[in-house]
């Protein structure tokens, strides 16, 4: 039986165990994931996006131009030229790569402001200490609630908001 074929019904001799707490990175045989490194978001104003996510509490790890054959080959856009800003969550694993495309310019989806059930990247959620304070700090940077701040049982206050370039973010405040 090849590695890709299914075992006969009842034959468990070739089945591999699911990852366990003692081996969390093992997935599908020898293929592994070490970690989720970052989420990439295309923006139309890199400075505004950096200011927004800095106000949210992220730290700017660095900014750099991205261009050349290697970059175009990776993303499938020959002759591309962009600038990226890598933002990180302090003292936690989690980074956002904000990218401003100069060549070719970014494509605006139609409709420009898509609803929450649009296929593709849905949203990025951040746990915050105080949801109302966070919203108050983000509003001057263009943040707008999508719905309303809502209590989920006795566990969380939750909301969706739009940030720079129409990015949907979710905020979650854990209730004690």
State each model region's role.
Residues 24-50, 56-64, 120-128, 172-176:
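N-terminal beta-strand motif that seeds the catalytic metal site of vicinal oxygen chelate
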């Amino acid at each position: 039986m090849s590695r890709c074929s299914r075992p006969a019904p009842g034959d468990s001799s070739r089945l591999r165990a699911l990852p366990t707490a003692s081996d969390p990175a093992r997935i599908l045989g020898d293929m592994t994931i070490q970690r989720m490194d970052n989420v990439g978001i295309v923006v139309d104003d890199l400075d505004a996006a950096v200011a927004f996510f800095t106000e949210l509490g992220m730290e700017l790890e660095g900014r750099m131009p991205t261009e050349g054959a290697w970059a175009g080959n990776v993303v499938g856009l020959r002759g591309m030229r962009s600038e990226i800003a890598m933002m990180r969550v302090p003292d936690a694993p989690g980074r956002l790569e904000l990218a401003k495309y100069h060549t070719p310019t970014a494509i605006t989806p139609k409709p420009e402001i898509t609803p929450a059930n649009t296929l593709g990247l849905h949203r990025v959620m951040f746990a915050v200490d105080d949801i109302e304070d966070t919203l108050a700090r983000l509003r001057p940077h263009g943040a707008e609630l999508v719905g309303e701040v809502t209590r989920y049982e006795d566990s969380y206050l939750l909301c969706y908001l739009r940030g720079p370039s129409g990015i949907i973010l979710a905020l979650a405040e854990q209730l004690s």
